[in-house]
Amino acid sequence: MFLKFFFAFLTMLASTQLFAQYDVPLYTSYTTEAARAKMNERLIKNSITKNLLLPLSDSTEENWEDAFDAMEVMNYHAPFVQSKVEAAFDSIGVRSVSFQRALMELAYANYPGKFIMQTNVLLEETTDPKIFAVCAEYLLQHKKTDAEKQILSKKLLEKFTDTAYKNPVLFMLSTRLKSADVNQQPVHEVLKDIVSKNFLPGQIVMYSFQRKNRDYPGMVLIRNADGNFVRDSSGNLFHLPQLARSISNLPGYLRNGNTPQGIFKMFGFGVSMSNFIGPTANVQMGMPVELSIQKFFDDSTILDSAWTIGWYQKLIPKKLQSYLPLYDSYYAGLAGRSEIIAHGTTIEPDYYAGKPYFPLTPTQGCLCTKEIWNGKRLESDQQKLVNGLLEAGGANGYCVVIEIDDKQAPVAIKDLLPYLKN
C-alpha cells in the first residue's frame, strides 16, 4: 500500500555514541526542488489518475486504495478525483472491509460532511466494529451534538450488545459518545502529578503536551532520570514544537489516527529508509500490547505474557487511575495500532500550506518535529530532540502524550510553566 511503503521505517537501533556524533550535515537527493516536482507528477499521474481510471472491482480495490492514500498525503482535490470518490461510495456496501476503511478515512480527511447519507447507510449495514466506528466518527465530525451522540450510542448497543464493552475499538467509541464530563479530574490537577518526580520515578520521560484540536502543534519537553527537566545552555527549559496529528485526523484508537494519549515505552534511536521520514535519527517507541510486558517494563524477570489493564496501571499513580485519557495508548495497542514513533520529516510541507500546523507535516499517527530540506537538511528540530534526549541520558524510558486543553493555538511554553516548578 502507498502509505505503508512511504512511511515504513527500518529499525536500526544504535548506540548513544553513534548518535552523539550524528549532528552532521545531511543530504537527500529526493528533497531537492526538482526531485519533489517529479515526485508530485508521479503521484498524480500514476498513484492517483492511473489507478482511478481502472474500473472498480474486487481485483482493482487495492489500486484505488493506493490512490486514496496518495490523495490524503498530498491533500489533493480535483473534480476528476471527486467524481471517482462519489462512484466509490455508490458501491461501498459491497466492497471489502479494507476498501471501506480506506474510503471512509479519505472522506474523513478530505471530504468532511459530503457523504453523510452514504455513511449512515454503511453504519446501519456493517457488522465490522472498526467500520462502524469510523462511520460514527465521520458523522460526529459533521454534527457533534449530544443528540447525535445519543443516537449513535443507541445504535452501537443495538448492533453489538454486550460486546461493545469488550471490543477495544467499540469501547473507545462509547467513551467518546458520552457527555464531556466523563473525565472527573480537571486536567490541570492531572498535569501537576504527571510532571512530578514521583511519576515514573527514575525514568527518562519525553513529554508531548498537545491541544485537543491536533491541527495545532504541541510541545515536547524532556525529564531526566533524576526528575529534572532538561535545560539549554542558557538555563532555559528545553522545548520544541511537536505535531501529534495524523494525515486523516481520526482519533487515536483508529488505524492511521492521531497519536493516542497515554504512556509509550521509549527504547532507543533508529534510522528510517522512508522517503517521507528521512535519515535524521528517530525515537523508537511502542505501546502496551504492541510490546511484550517484559519489554514495556524493561524487566526480563516478568513471567506473565498476557497483557491486562492491571499491568498498565502499575505505571499510573493511584489518584490518576480514573483519568481515562491516560489509557488511550493501552486501548490503541489492544486494537492493533503499532509503529508509532517520534521522527522528523522529509515530506513536502507545501502540501499543507495554510494549515495551522504548517510547516510541520502530519503523519500516520507518529509524533513529528519540523525539518526543512532542499537537498540539504536546512533546519532540524528532530536533531535537537535527539540531542536533548542524549543530554537526559538517552532514549530509554517512557514517552507521555497528554492533551492540556482545547485552546485554538499552538502550545507555548508559557502554557506549561505553571506545572513545571520542580
Predicted regions and their residues:
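Cyclophilin-type peptidyl-prolyl cis-trans isomerase
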Residues: 356-375
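Amphipathic alpha-helical protein-interaction segments enriched in hydrophobic
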Residues: 132-133
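Bacterial Sec-dependent N-terminal signal peptides
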Residues: 1-22
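A short acidic, amphipathic alpha-helical/loop segment
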Residues: 118-122
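Cell wall/extracellular polymer interaction/catalysis modules
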Residues: 22-76, 80-86, 90-101, 105-109, ...
